[in-house]
Amino acid sequence: YAAKDGSSLYLTIDSTLQNNCERELANCVDQNNDENRACSINKNAKTGDILAMATSPGYDLNDRNSIYSKKDQLTLEKYKEDNPDDEEGYNEKYAELREKQWKNKAITELYEPGSVFKVVTGSSALEEKVIDLNSTFTCNHSIQVADRTINCWTAGAHGTQDFTTAMTNSCNPAFIQIGQRLGIEKFCSYFRAYGFTEPTGIDLPGEASGLYVAEESMGIVELASCSFGQSNTVTPIQMITAYAAVINGGYLLQPHVVSKIVDNNGNVIQTVEKTVRRQVISEETSAEMRQVLESVVNNKGGTNPYIKDSLLNTSDAPDE
């Protein structure tokens, strides 16, 4: 067969944002001595477009067989030093570390989301009307759940606080109380609705899905820890997809990196449109959550700067 030109793939990636994302993420990893790699996703909450996605340490596509992580380099050196005659074992360890660095952490690796998950618990409780913006929650540093004492992340106590203040403080006992008001059945229902029990369907290979406490196995202790982002594990792409639904009117959108496909004559043969999987919360609840989250970042105690428009990047402090 005669060779013929293929089609061109146009991406949603913004090259400037991607460059900035890679640079700042690498700086963050260096400054915090992160030994488990890190990732960052920048997403348009209104459309599902992925504007930037990076993993650090990454690798050079022109030399993908080298090991770039300093930690992994030391691991290989130590293995060779301890096992000088075990060439087969060294090669197996090298292959394992090389394949790990090839993985896109944003879609393949699981983590406990921590405090960023509190928007899911909070929005679900608002939607069910078991709380409102004026509801109050008391933090005395710790809270007793059955035979467990669960502490807040701070060494002190937040005292009595309304919902917005509890979100600003990222208060664990407050969100345990919110989870208790929501209850196991409703909590698990919204956990499913926000997409945490299934892959997002992003148009990239190798997407994983989270590991979570099943509803039939969940007790009041598990509900407590899950309510502030512990016990369940998710992928970063699952978390940012759910977070986007919280603020975009309540719509769970399928994320994507492909914008369109154009043939060699310049004809658009496929355009990737916004795909709404479901509406999780109402427009009204979503508006309340936007109000709360804008207050969080604008008031003292908030953790990230306000960014105009619905571009979304998620993060969480390691001690939360």
What are these regions (language model features)?
Residues Y1, I13, K46-V116, V120-S315, ...:
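Beta-lactam-recognizing serine transpeptidase/beta-lactamase-like catalytic domain environment
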Residues Y1-A38, K46:
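Conserved, well-ordered alpha-helix/loop/beta-strand core segments that scaffold catalytic motifs
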Residues C39-I41, V258:
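Conserved beta-strand and immediately adjacent loop positions that scaffold enzyme active sites
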